[in-house]
Amino acid sequence: MRRTFNFLLLFFLSVMTVMAAPGDLQEKLAALKGISGIEKLQSDHYPEKYVVRITQQVDPKDPAAGTFTQRVIVGHVGYDRPTIIVTEGYGAAYALNPKYQEELSKLLNANLVFVEYRYFLESTPEPKN
């Protein structure tokens, strides 16, 4: 779990410290290690919004246990804005809605990183054990 947290922290810090022209976020995300898919989403509040899939080991102590894909939603308003991270305790499907905006993100005009919890919805390892 700590390894996953460290990876996610590094991932999000990398996203926010890279200075790039608008529209380059998708390329920057795709260049990060472990990213297995990016899909652009529609949003009423974020100029750029993506579903990012991160491939991780099921058990960091046992690489033979395989991997799973964790779903993360990234809403981007600017490199000069703060970032809110939501570590949802369940599924993240509601964050896919174009009208969704986290309350703090709205108040601070902040970027959003919304992490779906492992073993929920699309972030479920196969087989579950």
Predicted regions and their residues:
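Catalytic-loop region of hydrolases
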Residues: 20-110
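Active-site-proximal flexible loops/turns
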Residues: 9, 95-96, 123
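Bacterial Sec-dependent N-terminal signal peptides
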Residues: 1-24
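Catalytic nucleophile-loop/oxyanion-hole region of alpha/beta-hydrolase
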Residues: 123-129
